[in-house]
């Protein structure tokens, strides 16, 4: 009797954990479909790094103080590059 009860409870616990994991995977897959693909995100990151460093180089060549270009959307300019805050 105890063995049967333990087996039923174990199966129920495994079923609950499996269902929860499946729901999390489904939610993650829906988020990935809605958002930008990783390649597009990488391109945006590269553009931001390039944009900030080039603007500082141009200002230095003009004999002006290098004013760091403001990065928007959770990014800040550090060491002539936009970095995620």
Curated annotation (Swiss-Prot):
Disulfide bond found in the keyword field: yes
Location(s) in or outside the cell: Secreted
Record-annotated disulphide pairs: 52-66, 56-77, 71-82
Database matches in InterPro entries: Hwtx-2-like (IPR012625)
Key words, A-Z: Disulfide bond, Neurotoxin, Postsynaptic neurotoxin, Secreted, Signal, Toxin
Pfam families: Toxin_20
Keyword Oxidoreductase applies: no
Prosegment location in residue numbers: 23-48
GO molecular function, a single term: toxin activity
Subunit-structure text: Monomer.
Record family assignment: Belongs to the neurotoxin 12 (Hwtx-2) family. 02 (Hwtx-2) subfamily.
Protein name (record): U4-theraphotoxin-Hhn1a
Originating organism: Cyriopagopus hainanus (Chinese bird spider)
Lineage: Eukaryota, Metazoa, Ecdysozoa, Arthropoda, Chelicerata
